[in-house]
């Protein structure tokens, strides 16, 4: 039957100049085309009707190694017979990429005219997941899989699976309160407790009562599943754990300059020649910029035999994504290249590389808190929560010999850190939320079923 050239990543309104995950982030080989030799029986992709490419089968083997994969049958059965399903899993177990795909399979089989929407707390996470899932499903970004973030949309009427921020879905409810276009709604990172996600949790309970065929899937970190089950009338729970348990190494004392201590430790790890990428959790985005500059300056002073340090800044609140490095630089570098991912404590969803072996945690983070007395936001730098520290450790769940370096003593974890991060609805200015509830004809906060009262 000859040879078919299948071009699978067709970007519509997506602009590679503005949004581009570098090849060294996703571990791909950079091939733009897959060549498939046709035999007598070709397996067709049910989402676009085209034969699967050979890359699809390679990625399928990687997907089957994810910890979440063994729960697929249990999840599909729970989704078929329950309106709400809760999935509690460690970080990097694959729930954010695989669960929405399974929901799309459910809609294709049970509700063919309905789509799936999956919310993300961070804009870069929504775009990055859409790129990765479109690749795994062997479909075109902007057609069968798309994304919608503030001021940018890459979707079409044929889109079956859409990633978006929680604020985008909240605004969509203003025009269509019952969300009739969707058969399954997936709320990811519920444990982040953003204002938009909290509002969606309360409002979607009324939507579920009006639409018996609608399904709601909640993805959360392990520390919050009990709270969600109590809020959702004992909905079925699926629990997923990482493959490996990382070793935590604590500092003897609290560092007066945790930023400089983190950079010193980073260089020490690089000098050990142990393989693996490094994630550094810093206090604020200004520290990310400084660390990026200092690592690039120090690069010229390092022994070339150690290999190259590649800092990759990941900003949770910024609109741009990681720029693609020049291809000629990638090809010319033959020595070992170690990636250093720089982010803040809330940037954990942006870290999804598979080769992370070391994590450095400064133990503090900055967050914005609204002060009603002065009617202004204040930026506070405080110790992170115990649940957040555990999530930093879970990033190493796929590494058999991963280590978490905590730049604080172990007693600091139990004495100075709170058990959980407070809900944003209790610390943020709620003017926009009040206007949203008024638009939805809801009298006030008491009539919206929040997990935590504002």
Segments the model singles out, each with a brief description of its role:
Residues 1-454:
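P-loop NTPase motor module signature
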């Amino acid at each position: 039957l000859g040879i078919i050239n299948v071009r699978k990543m067709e970007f519509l309104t997506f602009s590679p100049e503005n949004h581009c995950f570098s090849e060294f982030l996703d571990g791909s080989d950079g091939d733009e085309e897959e060549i498939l030799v046709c035999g007598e029986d070709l397996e067709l992709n049910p989402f676009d009707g085209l034969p699967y490419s050979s890359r699809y089968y390679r990625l399928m083997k990687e997907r089957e190694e994810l910890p979440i994969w063994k729960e697929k049958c249990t999840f599909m059965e729970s989704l078929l017979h329950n309106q709400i399903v809760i999935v509690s899993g460690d970080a990097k177990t694959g729930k954010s990429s695989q669960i929405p795909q399974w929901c799309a399979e459910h809609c294709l089989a049970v509700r063919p005219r309905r789509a799936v929407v999956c919310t993300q707390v961070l804009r870069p996470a929504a775009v990055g997941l859409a790129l990765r899932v479109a690749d795994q499903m062997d479909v075109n970004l902007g057609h069968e899989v798309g994304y919608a973030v503030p001021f940018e949309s890459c979707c079409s009427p044929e889109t079956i699976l859409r990633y978006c921020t929680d604020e985008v879905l909240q605004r969509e409810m203003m025009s269509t309160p019952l969300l009739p276009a969707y058969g399954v709604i997936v709320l990811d990172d519920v444990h982040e407790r953003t204002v938009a996600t909290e509002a969606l949790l309360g409002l979607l309970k009324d939507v579920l009562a009006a639409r018996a065929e609608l399904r709601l899937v909640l993805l959360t970190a392990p520390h919050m599943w009990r709270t969600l089950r109590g809020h959702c009338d004992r909905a079925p729970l699926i629990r997923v754990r990482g493959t490996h348990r990382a070793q935590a190494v604590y500092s003897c004392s609290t560092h007066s300059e945790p930023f400089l201590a983190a950079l010193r430790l980073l260089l020490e790890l690089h000098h050990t020649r142990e393989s693996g990428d490094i994630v550094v959790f810093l206090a604020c985005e200004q520290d990310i910029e400084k660390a990026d500059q200092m690592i690039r300056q120090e690069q010229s002073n390092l022994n070339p035999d150690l290999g190259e340090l590649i800092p990759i800044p990941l900003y949770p609140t910024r609109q741009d994504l990681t720029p693609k490095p020049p291809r000629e630089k990638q090809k010319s570098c033959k020595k070992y290249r170690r990636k250093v991912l720089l982010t803040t404590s809330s940037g954990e969803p942006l870290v999804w590389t598979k080769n992370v072996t070391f994590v450095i945690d400064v133990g503090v983070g900055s967050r914005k808190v609204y002060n009603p007395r002065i009617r202004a936001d204040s930026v506070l730098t405080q110790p992170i929560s115990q649940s957040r520290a555990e999530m930093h450790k879970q990033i190493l769940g796929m590494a058999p010999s991963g280590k978490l370096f905590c730049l604080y003593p172990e007693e600091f974890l139990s004495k100075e850190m709170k058990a959980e991060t407070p809900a944003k609805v209790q610390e943020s200015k709620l003017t926009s939320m009040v206007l949203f509830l008024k638009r939805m004809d809801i009298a006030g906060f008491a009539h919206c079923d929040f997990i935590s009262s504002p």
